[in-house]
Every structure is written in C-alpha cells, then in structure tokens.
From Swiss-Prot:
Annotated GO biological process: methylation
Gene3D superfamilies named among the record's database cross-references: Vaccinia Virus protein VP39 (3.40.50.150)
One GO MF term attached to the UniProt entry: S-adenosylmethionine-dependent methyltransferase activity
Residue runs in coiled coils: none
Record protein name field: Uncharacterized methyltransferase ML2584
SUPFAM superfamilies, sorted: S-adenosyl-L-methionine-dependent methyltransferases (SSF53335)
Record-listed E.C. numbers: 2.1.1.-
InterPro entries: Methyltransf_11, SAM-dependent_MTases_sf
Similarity field: Belongs to the methyltransferase superfamily.
Keywords noted in UniProt: Methyltransferase, Transferase
Amino acid sequence: MDTRRRVWPVAIITPHVTDVFAQRATLTRSLQLLSEFRYEQPYPARFYRALAADTVAMVGDLWLSTHGAPPVGRILLDVGSGSGYFAAAFADAGVRYIGVEPDPREMHAAGPALVPKAGAFVRASGMALPFADDAVDICLSSNVAEHVPQPWQLGNEMLRVTKPGGLVVLSYTIWLGPFGGHEMGLTHYLGGARAATRYVRKHGHRAKNDYGSSLFPVSAADGLNWAASTGVAVAAFPRYHPRWAWWLTSVPVLREFVVSNLVLVLRPR
C-alpha cells in the first residue's frame, strides 16, 4: 500500500507525553538555542555541549511524563552518537549510555577530554543495529535521519531494540527548512545537486554534509507518515520552537518550511 498521502493529521496524539517538556519549551529557550547555532562550525564544543544539555533535558522530561520518574539508571542507545558530547551529558544525568556511530573520525573528534565521561561505544550503522530485540529502555537519534539513505529503516531498527513501554525519540532536520542545507546554507532551495556544486565551486572541496551521499532530502510528511504507520507514535513537535508554535506541525506544506527540526516520539508495545 502506498502511504505517501497518508499524513498524520495532528501534532500531538497523546498530550500528556509532552506535558513536562512543554513547560521548558519557552521562547527564551528557543532564542538561546538559535544563538548557539552560529558556533557549530568555528567552536563545535560549545555548540554540541549546549545541544547535548538541551537533549538530555528533553529526553528526561519525556521519560518523566510517561513513567513518573527520571530516567536515572536506564539504558539509552544513541544512534549516531558522534563525538561524545551527548555521552558526557547523559552520564552526568545518571543514564547508562551506549553510543552507535559508523564514522570513526566522529568517534574521536572530541578528543580525550570526554573519555572519562564516556559510556560504551559501538561502531555500526543505525540502519542495522547490532543489538537484540527489546534491549534498551530509550533509543535516541538526534539529527541523523537526514544523513542516511533509508531513514525509516533506521527508525524501525530503533523500535526493534527498544523494550515495550520504553521510549523512542527520533529528531531530524527537515530538508525544506532554513537549516536543511546544513553548511550549504540557503542554496539548497535551488536544489540539492546544484547547491552541492556551488559549494564545491566556492570552497574547492565537497561539503561534509554532501547532498546525495551524506545528506538527503527528508520531509516532515515523510516522518509523520512513518510514525503513523508504526501504530505506536505518541507525539510529534518542532524541536526548537516554543510550545505555542507547535501547532505548525499540523499544517501541510507550511510545516516543511517553518518547523525546521521535527521530533517524533514513539512507545513500543
């Protein structure tokens, strides 16, 4: 059956799931996060520490809403763990952290400063996780789905390894949003291939997030359709927006341009 037209019609299916986090999702938080984005390339440690702290808070709030207690002692699998900043932040929160990262360069990018904080790390693809079914309490993927050719295979793998009653949190950058082109800037609105060519012409090398090989056009509708097809989706909201702007997730076409980053929350049964 072709599900491309079957889009999840609402932003929140089970409102209580986001009750705690909604209190944190203020305009002040949104502006603070936005101000950090300019440091991603020149000062990545600053940017990723801020993003990691916010992610830990978001996951903790979602777990608290669904389970009535913080996720202390719970096992979290981070699909696309990168250079270890999330590991340090989750360790500080008392979460048992396992990171999965296919690129060894990313695994070592943060240097030795984070090693004492690190949990366990596995080099593997998120589209074929080397874990048994029902192995972890929480499965997180932050800004990874747009970098793999089969994002919903990644999503299905996340569901597979998460225990019934656990939590899957999948967040990704929407292609047509202002940050969809990553370091290519707004030129992605000219088309991905053209933007990639312009980047090479300007910088003399291909972008790290290279269209067609490490960056793919993933829409909000794609994610909402996939979430609906699983039967276990409980929430969807814009990651960086204040609570009063979450309604944008419900508006076709508009959401592709203004939601920017979509969070899908699922509870396996």
